[in-house]
C-alpha cells in the first residue's frame, strides 16, 4: 500500500496495539502530527514540557508492562527528552521515543534546531535509529518495539528526518512485534545453584526490579514459600513480593529495614533475583552479605560481577529459573534462621518518624496497598519505600537508578492513563513539585484523577539531611524559603487544593481526595528536621547505621 513515512509510523503504532502517545509538536514533526490528527484510535496527550512527556511514557510502561511512546520535535524538543529517556534506561523501562529532525540533506550542517539526537542518546538507549528511505520508517519502528521489550527492557529512539516522514513509502501490515525469546538457564548452572542452596543454613532472597519487569512475581512467591526463605527487596523490587507476607523483611540497603539489613549481614547464601547490586544497597562485598555465597540470577549477563563478585551465575528469564530451581529442591524449613530474624526485629525496631509514617501508613491502609503509587525523588521517595505496604507488582513507580527530581508528575500522568482502574497517588516533595508544577495544567485539561501529595517541608530535604549529618549543618542552597501556597497554585490551574497541617488530619483528607474522580493536590506539612532513618553512611554497614 502506498503511504508516507509519517502515515507508516502511525500504522505501525496501531499494529503494536498503541492507544496512547505523549508528546509536544514542532516543525520537524508536522507530518507526523497531521497523521495523528486523522487517526481516531490513538489518544495524544499534550504535556507542558517534553521531559514530562518522556516521564509519562515511562510511567505508562511501568504501570502496564506495555511499551510507552513519546514524540518530540528536533533540537530542543529532542534534547528535552534525554532525562526521561535516561530514567527509563536506568530502570529498564520499555519506551519508544520518536523524534523529528531536519531534512536529510541538512544533517550535519548545523541547521536550525538540528541536533544529533541519535548520538546524544546512544549511552542511554538500547538502540538509536536514524530512519532512512532505504529501510523505511515502518521497519525501524517495528524493530524499535521488539528491541524495547526483548531481554532487559529499555528505551529505543527512532529519529525521523522531515523529508523521510513526508516521502512516499510502501506499507504492508505486519503482525505485532514480539520480543526475542529469553535464553533458557543452563542445566549446569541450575545444578550448581541447587547444591549451594541445599547446603545453606541462613539463605536470603534479594529481589530487584527485574522480578517485576520480567513478570516473575508469582514464581518468586512460590519459590520463597516452598523453600521457606525470607525475602528482602531493593526499592525497585518493592511489590514483587507482598509486604504483608510472613517471609517479607522489607527494604534493604542504605535506608532499609533493620531486619532486612541484619539478614543480609548474617546470611550464608544470598540469592539475587533480578537485582543489580546498586551502591545504595551493596556498597561493597565487605559491607553487604560478607558471610554469604552469592547466586546471581539475571537476564543481562553484563550485570554479573559488575558491582559484586558472585559465586554462581544463572543467565535467563527469572521466572523460569525460579520454577526450575524450585522443582529441583525439597521443601525447606529454616526455622532456626527465621527465629534469628525475629530476634533482629525485636532488638532493632525500624524508626517511625511521626509525620511521614502516619501519613504514608494511613494512605497504605486506605488503598490496601493496591494503588498506583508514584514518587518523586528525595525523602518523599524513601519514606514511601519504607512505610507504604506494596501488595502487587507494578504498584511502585519511581526513578530508582537515575534519581531524577521532577519525574513524579509526568510518570503519574502516564500511570493513571495506563491503569485507570486503579487510583493513582503521587508522593512528591516541594522541591520536585516546583520542578514539574506546570503539568498541573495537563492534569486539569484531561481531568486525570491523580492525587498529588506534596510532602512539604520547605527545604531540599535529603540533601539538607546529608549536610546536617556530614557537613556540620552547613545548609548550602537547601533552604529556598519559597513560601509557595501550594493549594492556591493548584486552584490556579483548575485543580482542587487541600491541606494537611497535622498528620492527625491525614485520614479525613485522604478519604475525601481518594473519593474524587478528578485531580487533587494536597499540601502536607512536614517538619524540615524530620529525617529518613535508618541511614547507613557511605562505606558503612548495618553496624554503623544512624538511627536518630
Where are the regions a protein language model picked out?
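Generic enzyme active-site microenvironment
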Residues: 157, 296, 374, 427-428
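N-terminal alpha/beta PP-like core and its mobile active-site loop of ThDP/TPP-dependent enzymes
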Residues: 1-328, 366-369, 449-452, 470-472, ...
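Phosphate/pyrophosphate-binding active-site segments
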Residues: 171-173, 191-195, 291-377, 503-507, ...
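Thiamine diphosphate
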Residues: 98, 106-107, 112-113, 305-307, ...
Amino acid at each position: 500500500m502506498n503511504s508516507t513515512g509519517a502515515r507508516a509510523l502511525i500504522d505501525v503504532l496501531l499494529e503494536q496495539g498503541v492507544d496512547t502517545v505523549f508528546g509536544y509538536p514542532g516543525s520537524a514533526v508536522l507530518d507526523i502530527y497531521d497523521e495523528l490528527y486523522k487517526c481516531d484510535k490513538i489518544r495524544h496527550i499534550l504535556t507542558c514540557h517534553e521531559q514530562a512527556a518522556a516521564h509519562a511514557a515511562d510511567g505508562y510502561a511501568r504501570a502496564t508492562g506495555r511499551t510507552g511512546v513519546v514524540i518530540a520535535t528536533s533540537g530542543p524538543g529532542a534534547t528535552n527528552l534525554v532525562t526521561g529517556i535516561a530514567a527509563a534506561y536506568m530502570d529498564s523501562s520499555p519506551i519508544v521515543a520518536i523524534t523529528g529532525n531536519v531534512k536529510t540533506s541538512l544533517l550535519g550542517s548545523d541547521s536550525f534546531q538540528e541536533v544529533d539526537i541519535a548520538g546524544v542518546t546512544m549511552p542511554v538507549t538500547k538502540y538509536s535509529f536514524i530512519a532512512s528511505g532505504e529501510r523505511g520508517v515502518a521497519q525501524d519502528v517495528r524493530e524499535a518495539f521488539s528491541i524495547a521489550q526483548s531481554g532487559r527492557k529499555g528505551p529505543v529512539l527512532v529519529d525521523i528526518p522531515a523529508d523521510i516522514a513526508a516521502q512516499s513509502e510502501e506499507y504492508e501490515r505486519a503482525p505485532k512485534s514480539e520480543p526475542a525469546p529469553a535464553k533458557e538457564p543452563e542445566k549446569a548452572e541450575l545444578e550448581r545453584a541447587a547444591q549451594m542452596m541445599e547446603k545453606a543454613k541462613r539463605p536470603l532472597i534479594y529481589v530487584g526490579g527485574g522480578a517485576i519487569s520480567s513478570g516473575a512475581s508469582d514464581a518468586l512467591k512460590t519459590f520463597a514459600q516452598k523453600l521457606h526463605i525470607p525475602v528482602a527487596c531493593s526499592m525497585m523490587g518493592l511489590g514483587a513480593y507482598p509486604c504483608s507476607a510472613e517471609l517479607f523483611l522489607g527494604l534493604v540497603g542504605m535506608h532499609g529495614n533493620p531486619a532486612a539489613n541484619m539478614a543480609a549481614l548474617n546470611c550464608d547464601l544470598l540469592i539475587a533475583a533480578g537485582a543489580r547490586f546498586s551502591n545504595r544497597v551493596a556498597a561493597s562485598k565487605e559491607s553487604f552479605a560478607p558471610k554469604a555465597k552469592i547466586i546471581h540470577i539475571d537476564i543481562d549477563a553484563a550485570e554479573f560481577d559488575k558491582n559484586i563478585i558472585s559465586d554462581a551465575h544463572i543467565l535467563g528469564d527469572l521466572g523460569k529459573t525460579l520454577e526450575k530451581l524450585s522443582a529441583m529442591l525439597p521443601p525447606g524449613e529454616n526455622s532456626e534462621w527465621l527465629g534469628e530474624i525475629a530476634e533482629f526485629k525485636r532488638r532493632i525496631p525500624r524508626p517511625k518518624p511521626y509525620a511521614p509514617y502516619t501519613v504514608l501508613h494511613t494512605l497504605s491502609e486506605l488503598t490496601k496497598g493496591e494503588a498506583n503509587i508514584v514518587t518523586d525523588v528525595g525523602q518523599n521517595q524513601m519514606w514511601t519505600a519504607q512505610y507504604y505496604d506494596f501488595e502487587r507488582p507494578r504498584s511502585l513507580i519511581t526513578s530508582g537508578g537515575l534519581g531524577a527530581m521532577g519525574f513524579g508528575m509526568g510518570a503519574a500522568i502516564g500511570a493513571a492513563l495506563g491503569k485507570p482502574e486503579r487510583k493513582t497517588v503521587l508522593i512528591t516533595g516541594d522541591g520536585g513539585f516546583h520542578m514539574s508544577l506546570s503539568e498541573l495544567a495537563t492534569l486539569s485539561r484531561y481531568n486525570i484523577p491523580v492525587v498529588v501529595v506534596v510532602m512539604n517541608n520547605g527545604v531540599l530535604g535529603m540533601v539538607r539531611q546529608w549536610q546536617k549529618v556530614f557537613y556540620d549543618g552547613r545548609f548550602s542552597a537547601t533552604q529556598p524559603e519559597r513560601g509557595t501556597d501550594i493549594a492556591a497554585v493548584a486552584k490556579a490551574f483548575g485543580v482542587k487544593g487541600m491541606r494537611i497541617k497535622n498528620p492527625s488530619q491525614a485520614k479525613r483528607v485522604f478519604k475525601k481526595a481518594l473519593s474524587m474522580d478528578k485531580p487533587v493536590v494536597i499540601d502536607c506539612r512536614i517538619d524540615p528536621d524530620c529525617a529518613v532513618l535508618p541511614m547507613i553512611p557511605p562505606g558503612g554497614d548495618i553496624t554503623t547505621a544512624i538511627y536518630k
